[in-house]
């Protein structure tokens, strides 16, 4: 004998119902709340049977406004993590029903004030700034969404109102002050191409354009809004880096030329403190104006020499360090032009076996000067072996001892 799972009596009827793998009388299969007979579909919880409406009313999602259950066929609004009936999602001051995407302010997590009423009754209406709404007359007010024109300035605690099919938005908690982040959204390649094309057309899209992109890509409007914010920030950063790189490239491509440490020497300044001048403006008691080249009528020994570095070397001292002495006019028995030509040829073509003339080698220099001046010295006052004639021919102050001839 089969017993009914509802009334525990034997089933003597011709027909019976099998619910939850148990046999029931036809009249015993009914909703425990409204007592209506369940013929096609029923819901069970803790061994009790419910109809569809009563089951969702008792165990389904509750409306945060009226605390009643929400039927699967009802349209709802979402704000933060709470769900509301359409009739419960209204402004508490003007009773206007708030629509999707409209800006609002949340009070006590389940009461709402529209933007117009909040600004008209807030002390910050003069500033006309949504992100500073927390400094208004009611300190518990917090903005729920953000104006698209100000989305780059501040990431305020806001929520875009969406239908049940759209995802809920989690933002800053007013009391905790910590930002709650949802799961990371992965954007596919096709969706990314669509967003890039939209960004190329309008870098700062309106809400209507974002809604169209949400329908095309299947992404949440908040995700699209954040993607555009990050993209604009990246573009600004790249422009700043490119401008900085251009300035750096221009700086290193054409650096400032270093000025010479010593300006070009003017005539008469080659040896500022020396007794001889390489120009014709030198005057002394031994030489008149332009008398520097008396022994060289054709000019200096080298026609190309303009500085002491370019001039051929003539030793300034003998083997004992004695200066060569002063240069005087040639003796009457000599011919200045022929002797000067000979001296020029010998200096221009020094003997092959003579060492390199350096001031620190007085010995070899003495032998070279002996070969140069030989048996017929061009200068009558030149003394190589001693300093006797030097003292006879020159009574000039000793400051000339350190000077070089050429």
From Swiss-Prot:
DNA-binding region positions on the chain: 180-239
Molecular function terms, GO-annotated: cis-regulatory region sequence-specific DNA binding; DNA-binding transcription factor activity; DNA-binding transcription factor activity, RNA polymerase II-specific; RNA polymerase II transcription regulatory region sequence-specific DNA binding; zinc ion binding
Biased composition (Low complexity): 137-148, 315-327
Listed Pro residues bias regions: 352-362
Domain of life: Eukaryota
Residues annotated as domain LIM zinc-binding: 4-54, 63-117
Organism: Pan troglodytes
Gene: LHX1
Annotated disulfide bonds: none
Primary location class: nucleus
Modified sites of kind Phosphoserine: 162
Stated name of the protein: LIM/homeobox protein Lhx1
Domain notes: The LIM domains exert a negative regulatory function and disruption of the LIM domains produces an activated form. In addition, two activation domains and a negative regulatory domain exist C-terminally to the homeobox.
GO cellular component labels: nucleus; protein-containing complex; transcription regulator complex
Subcellular location: Nucleus
Function statement: Potential transcription factor. May play a role in early mesoderm formation and later in lateral mesoderm differentiation and neurogenesis.
């Amino acid at each position: 004998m089969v017993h009914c799972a509802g009334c525990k009596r034997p089933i003597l009827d011709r027909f019976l119902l099998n619910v939850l793998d148990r046999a029931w009388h036809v009249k015993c299969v009914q909703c425990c709340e409204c007592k209506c007979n369940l013929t096609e579909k029923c819901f069970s919880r803790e061994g009790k049977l419910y109809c569809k409406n009563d089951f969702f009313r008792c165990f389904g999602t509750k409306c945060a406004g009226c605390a009643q259950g929400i039927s699967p066929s009802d349209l709802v609004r979402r704000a933060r993590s709470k769900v509301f009936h359409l009739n419960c999602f209204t402004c508490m001051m003007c009773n206007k029903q708030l629509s999707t995407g409209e800006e609002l302010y949340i009070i006590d997590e389940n009461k709402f004030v529209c933007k117009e009423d909040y600004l008209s009754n807030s002390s910050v209406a003069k500033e006309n700034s949504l992100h500073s709404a927390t400094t208004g007359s009611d300190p518990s007010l917090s903005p729920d969404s953000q104006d698209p024109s100000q989305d780059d300035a501040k990431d305020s605690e806001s929520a875009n109102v969406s239908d049940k099919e759209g995802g809920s938005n989690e933002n800053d908690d007013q009391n905790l002050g910590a930002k709650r982040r949802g799961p990371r959204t992965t954007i596919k390649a096709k969706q990314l191409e669509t967003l890039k094309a939209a960004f190329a057309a309008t870098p700062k899209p309106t809400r209507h354009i974002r809604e169209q992109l949400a329908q095309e890509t299947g992404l949440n409007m908040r995700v699209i809004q954040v993607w555009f914010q990050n993209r604009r920030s990246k573009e600004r950063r790249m422009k700043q880096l490119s401008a900085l790189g251009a300035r750096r490239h221009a700086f290193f491509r054409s650096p400032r030329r270093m000025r010479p440490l010593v300006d070009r020497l003017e005539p008469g300044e080659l040896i500022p403190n020396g007794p001889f001048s390489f120009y014709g403006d030198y005057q002394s008691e031994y030489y008149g104006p332009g008398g520097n080249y008396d022994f060289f009528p054709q000019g200096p020994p080298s026609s190309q020499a303009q500085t002491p570095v370019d001039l051929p070397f003539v030793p300034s001292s003998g083997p004992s360090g004695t200066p060569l002495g002063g240069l005087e006019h040639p003796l009457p028995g000599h011919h200045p032009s022929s002797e000067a030509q000979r001296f020029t040829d010998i200096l221009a073509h020094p003997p092959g076996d003579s060492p390199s003339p350096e001031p620190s080698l007085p010995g070899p220099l003495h032998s070279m000067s002996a070969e140069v001046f030989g048996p017929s010295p061009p200068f009558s006052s030149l003394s190589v072996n001693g300093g006797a004639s030097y003292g006879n021919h020159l009574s000039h102050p000793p400051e000339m001892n350190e000077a070089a001839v050429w």
